[in-house]
């Protein structure tokens, strides 16, 4: 409902009003709002009702109840009267203004993190783990190293040249066996003790293809000068 500025109801806003209902109850509260149906909103409202005695000899007594915020229906309203003027603090801002004088307190920003000088709580022994970025193994130890890396080979070569024993990591096998003069090639059995191992192929010739033509097999003496050697493998000897 559109209410004009000259309405009498607007003149009583924030006043203490006494509202009498049809059943005889009286509501006294601060008048805050209304509508076209005369529904009222009262705050800090108190209810007063008269209680009739059981005997005619006793006087009628009045009972008070504190209600607070009340929405009062207009159909039950009989009359409204002004009980008192508006409170003195009506219209005063609850929030302090920018130019208002400050109080004795000191405004400080909310702290972030742990304040200085406060000891850090320590975890029980056995439950404290490594803090990220503090302590723990170095980056070189945590770097994964594969078999036959260039760094491992260079370190082993440097240690062997210096005469220090080379240490190999556990679980990756021991050092490779030394390749001596009489060591058998891979895949062949070693000769019995006391027997000279067979001679390997000459330099520059791939193993496993036999000896060149005109040369005896390993372990045999060459023929005397002027005499033909044995025929090559796969050929029949000449007839006499």
Curated annotation (Swiss-Prot):
Residues 174-205, 214-240 have a biased composition (Pro residues). One of its GO terms (biological process) is spliceosomal snRNP assembly. Keywords: Cytoplasm, Methylation, mRNA processing, mRNA splicing, Nucleus, Repeat, Ribonucleoprotein, RNA-binding, Spliceosome. Sequence repeats lie at residues 175-181, 191-196, 216-221, 222-228, 230-236. The modification Asymmetric dimethylarginine is found at residues 108, 112. GO terms for cellular component: catalytic step 2 spliceosome; cytoplasm; cytosol; methylosome; nucleus; SMN-Sm protein complex; U1 snRNP; U2 snRNP. It comes from the Eukaryota. SUPFAM superfamilies: Sm-like ribonucleoproteins. The modification Omega-N-methylarginine is found at residues 108, 112, 147, 172. Residues 163-240 are annotated as: Disordered. The keyword Glycoprotein does not apply. Its main location: cytoplasm. CDD domains: Sm_B. SMART domains: Sm. InterPro entries: LSM_dom_sf, Sm, Sm_dom_euk/arc, snRNP-assoc_SmB/SmN. The modification Dimethylated arginine is found at residues 108, 112. It is found in: Cytoplasm, Cytosol; Nucleus. Residues 175-236 are annotated as: Repeat-rich region. Methylated by PRMT5. Arg-108 and Arg-112 are dimethylated, probably to asymmetric dimethylarginine. GO terms for molecular function: RNA binding; snRNP binding. The keyword Repeat applies. Core component of the spliceosomal U1, U2, U4 and U5 small nuclear ribonucleoproteins (snRNPs), the building blocks of the spliceosome. Most spliceosomal snRNPs contain a common set of Sm proteins, SNRPB, SNRPD1, SNRPD2, SNRPD3, SNRPE, SNRPF and SNRPG that assemble in a heptameric protein ring on the Sm site of the small nuclear RNA to form the core snRNP. Component of the U1 snRNP. The U1 snRNP is composed of the U1 snRNA and the 7 core Sm proteins SNRPB, SNRPD1, SNRPD2, SNRPD3, SNRPE, SNRPF and SNRPG, and at least three U1 snRNP-specific proteins SNRNP70/U1-70K, SNRPA/U1-A and SNRPC/U1-C. Plays a role in pre-mRNA splicing as a core component of the spliceosomal U1, U2, U4 and U5 small nuclear ribonucleoproteins (snRNPs), the building blocks of the spliceosome. Component of both the pre-catalytic spliceosome B complex and activated spliceosome C complexes. As a component of the minor spliceosome, involved in the splicing of U12-type introns in pre-mRNAs. As part of the U7 snRNP it is involved in histone pre-mRNA 3'-end processing. Belongs to the snRNP SmB/SmN family. PANTHER family: SNRPN UPSTREAM READING FRAME PROTEIN, SNURF, SNRPN UPSTREAM READING FRAME PROTEIN-RELATED. This is Small nuclear ribonucleoprotein-associated protein B'. It comes from Monodelphis domestica.
